[in-house]
Amino acid sequence: MNLYDVYPLFDINIVKGQGCKVWDDKGQEYLDLYGGHAVISIGHCHPHYVEMLTNQLNNLGFYSNSVINKLQVKLAERLGKASGYEDYQFFLINSGAEANENALKLASFTNGRTRVLSIEKAFHGRTSLAVEVTNNPKIIAPINDNGHVTYLPINDLEAWEKELAKGDVCACIIEAIQGVGGCNMVTQEFAQGLQAACKKYGTFLICDEIQCGYGRSGKFFAHQWLGIKPDLITVAKGIGNGFPMGGVLISPEFTPVYGQLGTTFGGNHLACTAALAVLDVFEKENLVENAHEVGEYLIAQLKELQKRNSHITEVRGRGLMVGAVLDIPHKEVRSKLIHEQHCFTGCAGTNILRILPPLVLTKENVDDFIGRLETVLKEV
């Protein structure tokens, strides 16, 4: 049997990781400024993480949600305190797409509506509802194209209010900082106006924090820079530092019903242990604060590089979620960074470098990256 070939791959086999570095099967070291799509939060193979998962695996890896799992309760309590959402409820699943699916289902269950507003260039996942609110026709199959979603420009409050006033919108789903969309940022004025309009018209506000959340922006959640409190918050990626996990933070206004939502693997013992290890390291190593401090330094250094090299036309983002907009396609730049400078970055669109490193990134790592990027930009 062959793999179903849907991923355009770099010819590199990564076999080892530590902190912000990874190594291939030939022993070549790489600086990791992408963290596997913003998944790696506390660094590759953090010793506390490895120890906790190993110990848990020696006891119990999995049992079903038909019995008590005190690790789930502990995680919900810890996450509530860390994020400032102690009064919310927590539903555990396996991925970001699944988190968005369940958030949208909860909203629709509660207000009985079916229409959703989503931001242009949004990406919320590849499963049924999640892909429908994703603004990319290439990945929406006919079976998913049900006409439930209206895509609107980011930060155009008037356009959103006009749609909400129709009184039939189930939910608005937004990323405070767009990921695949290119690190575009929601403004405070738009976010607060949207929240007020949602409350006025009986619409639920969902914040997708799967990529921009979990400390990456320099606050626990990126929407906390905007002064809003969403009805539903979706998390994944950094929550498990590579272990598949997702969740929905659910406001107290939602009343749970037996059988309403469910999952086989979600919230399993290993996943909860991974998430608890992440929170331990967040607290011990002050990683949210580090993301803010080192992120500001990264953005400042990219803007200095922009002054020296005209290929960078704009620097976007916050914390350790940063986009460098280029006046040339990113393809050659990324290829040279990987194959010649041995540095991983991501991309968005056709001309944006997306930088999503582990939150343990240091200023020395930033200086190292800027040097490698400058070398490449001089050559292209």
What residues fall within each predicted segment?
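Conserved N-terminal phosphate-binding loop of PLP-dependent enzymes in the Aspartate aminotransferase
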Residues: 1-380
